Amino acid sequence: DIVLTQSPASLAVSLGQRATISCRASESVDSYGNSFMHWYQQKPGQPPKLLIYRASNLESGIPARFSGSGSRTDFTLTINPVEADDVATYYCQQSNEDPYTFGGGTKLEIK
């Protein structure tokens, strides 16, 4: 199975500042010219919400404050600027190889 390692596990950012979350895969998640890495936001009591698909594509309805980058094994989710509503846990997920796997999550808090 592909192991996804997120860092940091938790992050405290001031309102209006930038939050950066990293995800490293144990092997490449690239195929056919695409990176099959996705980012989700989860708030307590709610299902995960897709933010970014295939590394850098913004899901419909998601603010452009969210962006994703990376390829092969190293990926980044950036939130800039951070707003109060962004308090949540963020997960990376790969869909290049079965079983699809998630990172351990990064909890974002406001400083």
From Swiss-Prot:
InterPro entries (alphabetical): Ig-like_dom (IPR007110), Ig-like_dom_sf (IPR036179), Ig-like_fold (IPR013783), Ig_sub (IPR003599), Ig_V-set (IPR013106), IgV_Light_Chain (IPR050150)
Keywords: Adaptive immunity, Disulfide bond, Immunity, Immunoglobulin
Region ranges (Complementarity-determining-2): 54-60
GO cellular component, one term: immunoglobulin complex
Residues covered by region (Framework-3): 61-92
Framework-2 as annotated region, ranges: 39-53
Pfam short name (any one): V-set
CDD domains (UniProt xref): IgV_L_kappa
Classification via PROSITE patterns: IG_LIKE (PS50835)
Disulfide bridge positions per record: 23-92
Region (Complementarity-determining-1): 24-38
Region (Complementarity-determining-3): 93-101
Record GO biological process: adaptive immune response; immune response
Renumbered residue ranges of the record's region Framework-1: 1-23
Region feature (Framework-4): 102-111
Source organism, top-level taxon: Eukaryota
Matching SUPFAM superfamilies: Immunoglobulin
Miscellaneous comment in the UniProt entry for this protein: The PC 3741 and TEPC 111 sequences are identical.
PANTHER family in alphabetical order: IMMUNOGLOBULIN LIGHT CHAIN
Protein name according to UniProt: Ig kappa chain V-III region PC 3741/TEPC 111
Taxonomic lineage of the native organism: Eukaryota, Metazoa, Chordata, Craniata, Vertebrata
